Regions:
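Ligand-binding loop in jelly-roll beta-barrel domains
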Residues: 89-113
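Bacterial N-terminal signal peptides that target proteins for export
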Residues: 1-8
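Extracytoplasmic
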Residues: 33-38, 57, 64, 89, ...
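A short glycine-rich, His/Asp/Glu-containing loop-to-beta-strand
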Residues: 23-50, 107-110
């Protein structure tokens, strides 16, 4: 089973970096500006992000299929058209437990002071 690792970081001193390293179905950066990073993440059945957190808050919108979001608040099943919000540094895992392909738009606001 492959896993994807999500990492979005803001670096103090006014520089911002965003990085998504994926093994498996993959991802595509849809928008990467100085203020926001949007990525379309594709998860094959059984694939997940692995437990991770992002420095800024994270918004996810399920575009296709179904995923399970696990966080300290519990487990939540999200179907296409549903969204989630996680405050910065919240540990979480996004997993495709279905037998269909799942696609999620992941949005992180960059903070460069």
């Amino acid at each position: 089973m492959t896993k994807a690792l999500f990492f979005v970081a803001g670096i103090a001193v006014g520089l911002c970096t965003s990085l998504f390293a994926a093994q498996g179905a993959g991802s595509i950066a849809v928008l990467n500006t100085s203020g926001v990073y949007i990525e379309l993440v594709t998860l094959v059945p059984g694939e997940g992000s692995g437990q991770h957190s992002t420095i800024p808050g994270e918004v996810g919108i399920v575009a296709e299929g179904e995923v399970v979001l696990s966080s300290p608040a519990g487990r939540e099943s999200l179907q296409a058209g549903k969204a989630y919000w996680l405050p910065g540094l919240t540990p979480h895992d996004i997993r495709n437990e279905s037998n269909r392909l799942a696609k999620v738009y992941v949005i992180a606001m960059k903070r460069c002071d």
